[in-house]
A protein has these predicted regions:
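N-terminal active-site segment of His-dependent metallophosphoesterases
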Residues: 1-66
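His/Asp/Glu-rich metal-coordinating catalytic cores
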Residues: 47, 57-152
Length: 152
């Protein structure tokens, strides 16, 4: 099995807001993410794990559409996506209504859940933030459902 893992991409951030280079830096972050997707297309990992803060704030509908278009370029890779403490799910979040490509598994809840992948004999556990901060140690009580499988 091969997987890629990224976190804290912070798409949509405006580094050094007000400076002449701010917009270019913001675009550089999007370009870097698109380049990472191209690497995934070349390397064909089984999984792309995105463990929070793909966005710097609540994603706009057009931003999610752009990301979905990028994910659709790697249909051979299962994308597992969690919302983090910057892009946490709110009542009006477009995360809740996004129509993800078939290869995307989004963790919609703030309680640990899992996705099973029989072809890879793998189970992936995760959760999304629904608040800026989670104070409980939610993973402390999580134990693999099946120890004969690969559990991530």
């Amino acid at each position: 099995m091969k997987f890629m893992h990224i976190s804290d991409v912070h798409l949509g951030v405006k580094p050094d807001a007000g400076k002449a280079w701010s917009e270019k830096r913001a675009q550089d972050i999007w370009d870097s993410f698109a380049e990472m997707i191209e690497i995934a297309a070349e390397e064909s990992p089984d999984f792309l794990l995105i463990s929070g803060d793909l966005f710097h704030k609540q994603p706009l509908k057009r931003e999610l559409k752009e990301v979905c278009g990028l994910f659709a370029r790697i249909p051979q890779t299962k994308v597992l996506l969690m919302a983090g403490n910057h892009d946490y799910i709110q009542q009006n979040s477009f995360y809740r209504t996004c129509e993800w490509p078939e290869n995307v598994c989004f963790f919609p809840r703030e309680e640990v859940m899992c996705f099973d992948f029989p072809e890879q004999n793998t189970t992936v556990y995760g959760l999304s933030y629904w608040h800026r901060e989670i104070r409980q140690a939610l993973y402390d009580e999580v134990f693999p459902k099946n120890t004969d499988r690969i559990n991530i």
